[in-house]
A protein has these predicted regions:
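Conserved glycine-rich FAD pyrophosphate-binding loop
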Residues: 11, 134-273
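C-terminal substrate-binding/cap subdomain adjacent to the FAD-binding core in PCMH-type
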Residues: 3-162
Length: 273
């Protein structure tokens, strides 16, 4: 909600406060949040937190193919059942989730519902009907197992022994299917989060040429790529974030305003900034 910090010129700056108001200043807090420590040293923070939900359950749909999974996620997230999470794991990741309430080990789509106990059960029942699911097509993860499942998803457990390259790809949900289909030429393994908009992808071989090709594919579908884990030689030559010329100029001007001598994390986000 707000912060106090010191910029690269040694000036103390403040923004926001302890409550959200419809006044100027909140945009600056959002700017600093996404700056990866390149604009200020933060000395004070005001953060809004939400109470832990009383109950969390997860509807797991068995063995959908990618197109059907995205259809399920799209319908669920636009429904009145108010899901708090939606993810798709292809077949090759299914065996990573051994849970008592999970009755199969193949590909799966998972949709989380949270809130008061009675509300969660009613919304789960309504959602399964809205998606026209049969009992044999689904499993329900109860509170404890639901929390385990989403903790593993958040921590990228399916990639915990990864030795290859890991990319974070964000695209509009309407573009996800086409992007995945085009990236299959690069021996991709992936799972999808954010209800279809976030793709965590690993590639056996990733050169500068292939990375640029992947970025161009994603960019054509209005998305961007972030490097999470890459080999050392590639890390030295490639930018972590996808560079858009217009946004690069804006970022450069912002950097010059906050930190003209480039003291804070130079090159952290973009080469030269």
């Amino acid at each position: 909600l707000g912060f106090q910090g010191i910029n690269g010129k040694g000036e103390i700056i403040k923004s926001g406060g302890t409550v959200v108001k419809n006044v100027t200043g909140y945009d600056l807090s959002k700017l600093i949040t996404g700056s990866f420590g390149t604009l200020t040293i933060l000395t004070e923070l005001s953060i809004k937190v939400l109470p832990k939900p009383e109950m969390s359950k997860t509807l797991v749909i068995k063995n959908p193919h990618l197109k059907k999974a995205l259809d399920f996620l799209g319908k669920a997230l636009s429904s009145s059942t108010d899901p708090s999470g939606g993810v798709f794991y292809p077949d090759y990741f299914g065996k990573n989730f051994v849970l008592n309430d999970l009755t199969h080990d193949g590909g799966l789509t998972a949709i989380r519902i949270e809130g008061p106990i009675n509300s969660v059960d009613q919304r789960l029942d309504r959602l399964s009907k809205e998606l026209s699911l049969l009992d044999q097509e689904l499993s329900i993860l109860d509170n404890e197992q639901s929390n385990i499942f989403w903790s593993r998803t958040k921590n990228l457990d399916v990639f915990k022994n990864l030795k290859n390259n890991l990319l974070r790809i964000v695209v509009p949900i309407s573009e996800t299917l086409q992007v995945i289909q085009k990236l299959k030429n690069y021996e991709i393994k992936y799972f999808i989060d954010w209800g279809g908009s976030l793709v965590w992808a690993t590639f056996d071989k990733l050169s500068t040429k292939i990375l640029n090709e992947i970025r161009n594919i994603v960019k054509k579908h209005q998305g961007y790529v972030t490097l999470i884990k890459v080999e050392e030689d590639l890390k030295a030559s490639a930018d972590i974030f996808t560079i858009d010329p217009i946004r690069y100029k804006i970022s450069d001007k912002i950097k010059r305003s906050f930190d003209p001598k480039r003291i804070f994390n130079p090159g952290k986000m973009y080469t030269g900034i």
